[in-house]
């Protein structure tokens, strides 16, 4: 089955992306160790939750790439929106965590960024620079899952002991 219209592809991909993100959150406790555990959010830090804006859209676009020109072309076009969505999730997530302890704000941000990422992935032109940035961000997610730096985006909001040295 090929879906020709961009809106139809979006209508297929958006719930799939949200479902994949929900599965990632559900698997968080049972698969928290090892390489696969590095793909899942390990805690409620903005960096870890930004994995929801990175891995589910990539997986969704890879799974549905036949509908829009094959895996290579689809992921090349999607590189910039996915990188920007994940970085915006980390940045605005850090701001949201500092302003409110509500995870609903972060989840709403994730839903909006997932929709924007998938919509832009249909229209963006591919570039090797964005593909390299996509790979670098993926490597950073793996690296910082095991040894995160002591910076606000990487710290769990409820961890007062970790946040104390950062306080002015």
Regions found by a protein language model. Give the residues of each.
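Alpha-helical transmembrane segments and their helix-start/interface "positive-inside/aromatic belt" motifs
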Residues: 2-15, 126-135
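Alpha-helical transmembrane segments
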Residues: 9-22, 84-85
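Membrane-interfacial loop-to-transmembrane alpha-helix junctions, especially the N-terminal start
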Residues: 10-13, 72-82
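Hydrophobic cores of alpha-helical transmembrane segments in multi-pass inner/ER membrane proteins
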Residues: 17, 51-64, 110-122
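Alpha-helical transmembrane segments of multi-pass membrane proteins
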Residues: 17-33, 142-148
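Short aromatic-rich membrane-water interface segments that cap or initiate transmembrane helices
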Residues: 38-52, 161-168
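Membrane-interface helix caps and helix-loop-helix hairpins in membrane proteins
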Residues: 95-104
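C-terminal, well-folded lobe of enzymatic/effector domains
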Residues: 104-168
